[in-house]
Amino acid sequence: MEIFNVEELINMKPFKNMNKITINQKDNCILANRCFVKIDTPRYIPSTSISSSNIIRIRNHDFTLSELLYSPFHFQQPQFQYLLPGFVLTCIDKVSKQQKKCKYCISNRGDDDSLSINLFIPTINKSIYIIIGLRMKNFWKPKFEIE
């Protein structure tokens, strides 16, 4: 992808409500509710990362990246801000047209009910990536309202 700075990321409107984001110019990062999008050289891409087109197995269930992004578990949570799945899929599509691969991994943060996803999307500069972190609290916890 041809992205060089945080302003170009902002123009792509990665979040539902762009008025409620925090911009960290020093770190080339856009922060929102439990998620971030930044342009940087990753310290490392975990060896457990898989291609964005592959299925990942979590708790004996198979998921595609799209299923995780559009998950009803996530959107049922009351929050004022979330990462737009269409933004992620558009980035992946643009990169795949350039014959490059995006990777993602699930990171274990010690909370059994949460899900943390890290995505690594290459840019034209080989060492620079768009790094997306998505943290979903209570992902595995069923919630019921009794009337």
From Swiss-Prot:
It comes from the Viruses. Keywords: Early protein. InterPro entries: Poxvirus_F15. Induction: Expressed in the early phase of the viral replicative cycle. Pfam families: Pox_F15. Belongs to the orthopoxvirus OPG058 family. This is Protein OPG060. It comes from Vaccinia virus (strain Western Reserve). The gene is OPG060.
